[in-house]
Amino acid sequence: MSLQQVSMADLQRLAEASADVLDQVRDAMMAPHPLKTAPTFTSVSIAELCGIDKSQVKYLTQKHNLPAGRKIEGSKAKEYTLEDAMTWVKALGTYPARPEGKPGKVISVCNYKGGVAKTSTAVALAQALTLRGLKVLMIDCDGQGTATQLCGISPEREVDVEQTLMPFIHGDQPDLQYAVQPTYWHNLSVIPASSGLLAAEFALPAKAMRQRGFKFWEVLKDGIEPLRTQFDVIVIDTSPSLSHLTVNAMIAADGLVMPCPPDALDFASSVQFWGIFSELVESLPDAKLKCYDFVTIIYTKVRGNDIARLVKTWMKQAYGTHVNGIEIPESTAAQMASAQIKTIYDLSKPDGSVEAYRRYKEPLDRLADYVLDQLALAWDALPKTASAQSGLFDAAVVQA
C-alpha cells in the first residue's frame, strides 16, 4: 500500500464533484417536478386535521362553502390541496389563533450535537403549525442549509449569500424583511442559509471588537422584531453548536425546544450545552434578565431498549418538568422521508408501513399541539399593546 497524498486542489475537485452528485440526487428525488411540491389530503385526513368525523365533511362543505376537493380520476375518492386543508382549519376554528394586536412568537430549536433530528424536527414543527392555521417563518441559522433544503431550496445552487442573514449582520440592511422568501408550502416562508452564512462566526466578534457597546447576542432579535407583526410564529433552526448565531437565536426566542435522543452521550452533551449557555448568559449585560415562555426537551430517535429507558430516567431527574414526555421514535418512516429530502408532513400517504408512518407522525403532531398550547398561554398573558419582548427567565433553571 502506497502513501496517498491529497492536495488542496484535489479537495476542491472533490467538493465540486460531490456538489454535482447532490444536485443530481435532489433533481431525481423531485422528478417529475423540477421543484418540491406540497402534499395532497384525503377527506379522512381533512377530518382528522379538523377534529371532526369524516361523515361531517360533506355537510360542512355545503354549510360553510368550504373547498370540496377534486375527484381523483378512476376513483370515487377526492383529494384536497394544502391550501384547501388550511382553509378548512381556519374556517372551523379548530386551533388557537394569534390574538389581534399581539406579536408573533419566536421558537428556537437547538442542541449542541448533530445527528439528534434537530433540523427535521424544526421543519416538521413549522409545517405542523401551518396546518393548525398559523402563518410561519422558518429561519435557517445553520450554514449547512439543511432546513433550507427541506423548504425546497438548494442552499448551494439557489441561495446567494445576499439572500441569507449576512447583509443584516454586516449592517447593510435595517432588518430581515429583505431575506424572507415564499416556499412550496402555503403559509410557510423561509430565510434561507448557505455556506456563506458561516462568515457570521467571524463577522459578529469582529464587529464587537470594533464597536464599543455592540451587543453581538441581540443582532438577530433586533432583525426579527418587524417580522413579529407579519408572522404568527417564527421557527429558528440552529447549528449543532453553541455558536454566535445559536446564541443569537436563543436570545431572540420566546420558547426553546431541544430534541435529544435518550442516549448517554447525547444526554451528556445536552448537560454541557445548558451549562455553557448559562455561564455565557451570566457574562452578557441584560441577557441574564432573559425570560422564556417555555423551555421543553423532547426525546428523539427513541429505541425501545433498556439503555434508552435508563437514560430517560436520567433526563427526567436532570430536567424535571422541562421534559414533556413526547417520544419521537427512530423510524424507517423518517429515513424514507429523509431519503426523498422530505419531512413526514410532505408525504401525501405513507411510503411503506402505515403503522411506522403513524408511530412517527403522531408524536410530531403532539409536539405541535403542545407548542401551540404554550403559545396560546403566552399570548393570553400579554396585554394587547405589549411589546414583543420576553419577560424574565433565569437560564440556569434548565439545569435543575
Spans of features found by a protein language model:
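P-loop NTP-binding core
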Residues: M1-L49, K54-A400
